[in-house]
Amino acid sequence: MKLRFAGTILREMLPDRWHMTAFAPTSNDRSIKVDGLKTHDNYQLLNRELAADDPWRLDGNPFERKRHAQMLLLSLAQGPIANALEVGCAAGAFTEKLAPHCQRLTVIDVVPEAIDRTRRRMNKPAHISWVVSDVQQFSSEELFDLIVVAEVLYYLGDIAEMRMAVGNLLRMLAPGGHLVFGSARDANCQRWGHVTGAETVIAILTEMLVEVERLELQGDSDNEDCLLVRFRNPVSSS
């Protein structure tokens, strides 16, 4: 599989200097403001968290485990997955669950240390491609029958950027393909200092996709809040 990024073809096995991870927020510390994804302070915060034994408690927190379990069920609802895209891998907790069900999986993110950690966790399986990119700039020469984008888009600076990111992803979604979206609700995201959250992005996605299934998750704390929605691309392949 070939992926095109910034005019360069990136193949399946990339040199270490190209490894990246996407911004994947968590329910435990999603209040960190990320006004510019590439600022030094934000990278320092992410790198410190990634150095922990269980970054963002994605493995140990019951709410996060439930969120990932429900994301996986939504991802598998359409049947076998030939070619999937995961936008944002954090430390690989969900990647590890999704990968065995995919013939091919592409993982994109913007923080190199996150992809490095996920690759080590996954023992570098041959059917996974790792790409350093953000969601607005990434592009693929192939279409995906599944795209998973969870706890990522509210890090963008404004709704126009969110629309741009959504439009970019939908150009890579195969006819009849599914997109699984997850995010905390608007109110929580705005309380954390972000522009908006789940309801706003869902409305944007609904303009172009068909909503198939929706799940609402709530944990013990106010920060443990998530809407998960599975969408289908209504465009026919014929």
Swiss-Prot record:
SUPFAM superfamilies per the UniProt record, alphabetical: S-adenosyl-L-methionine-dependent methyltransferases (SSF53335)
Domain of life: Bacteria
Single GO MF annotation: S-adenosylmethionine-dependent methyltransferase activity
Enzyme Commission code: 2.1.1.-
Keyword match Ribosomal protein: no
Gene3D superfamilies membership: Vaccinia Virus protein VP39
Alphabetical keyword list: Methyltransferase, Nodulation, Plasmid, Transferase
Alphabetized InterPro entries for the sequence: NodS, SAM-dependent_MTases_sf, SAM-MeTfrase_NodS-like
CDD domains named among the record's database cross-references: AdoMet_MTases
Keyword Methyltransferase: yes
Additional remark text: Necessary for nodulation on Phaseolus vulgaris and on Leucaena leucocephala.
Function comment: SAM-utilizing methyltransferase involved in nod factor synthesis.
Family according to the record: Belongs to the NodS family.
Protein name (database record): Nodulation protein S
Gene: nodS
